[in-house]
A protein has these predicted regions:
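Canonical Radical SAM [4Fe-4S] cluster-binding loop centered on the CxxxCxxC motif
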Residues: 2-39
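Catalytic metal- and UDP-sugar-binding loop of GT-A-like glycosyltransferases, i.e.
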Residues: 11, 58-59
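Radical SAM/AdoMet-radical enzyme domain recognition
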Residues: 35-58, 66-168
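Conserved G/P- and acidic residue-centered "switch" motifs that form tight phosphate/ATP-binding loops
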Residues: 62
Length: 168
């Protein structure tokens, strides 16, 4: 019984983030921020494609802060890979959604809370929830398959139904 090759590889392109979430281990890091170089990313993608792995997921920190994101996602697409992006969603605009849509198959937008007030308390900024909802709409309007993720707890489970209605 051999080990099967992975179906998907996650590539962490940076560890920078535009949030300061109270629960995140990265917010207190005193180390220099790390960005994957364009050349390193291309080598990894070539290796993934050569090994017959079908999917690549771009993660971070916040991958939309990485200056090479569009170029490298396009490169992955040219290699025949299914491309996914994990993001907090706050940096998307109608323009960036339109630019990335042709090379993105799937986007996962993370919600740390189920409403704007709670998101602000956890992440230290106002209006983040609405930015995420706007990003989802912009991406979906461009034909990108968009998913939302969140963590449920005893503190927020009562807001789940309202959250689902918002996403519809």
């Amino acid at each position: 019984m051999g080990i099967k090759k992975p179906f998907e590889i996650s590539l962490e392109v940076n560890d920078s983030c535009n949030y300061s979430c109270e629960f995140c281990f990265g917010k207190n890091s005193v180390d220099k921020r790390i960005d994957l170089s364009r050349e390193q990313a291309k080598k990894v993608i070539e290796k993934i494609a050569a090994e017959g792995i079908e999917r690549i997921r771009f993660t971070g920190g916040e991958p939309l802060l990485w200056p090479h994101l569009q170029e490298i996602i396009s490169f992955a697409k040219q290699q025949g890979l299914f491309t996914s992006l994990n993001t907090n969603g706050s940096l998307f605009s109608k323009e960036s959604a339109k630019e990335l849509a042709p090379v993105l198959d799937d986007v996962l937008v993370s919600f740390h809370a189920l409403n704007d007030k709670s998101e602000q308390q956890l992440c230290g900024q106002k209006g983040l929830f609405d930015k995420k909802i706007s990003a989802i709409k912009d991406l979906a309007n461009q034909g990108v398959f968009v998913r939302a993720s969140t963590i449920l707890s005893g503190q927020n489970i009562s807001a789940l139904e309202e959250f689902n209605k918002t996403l519809e």
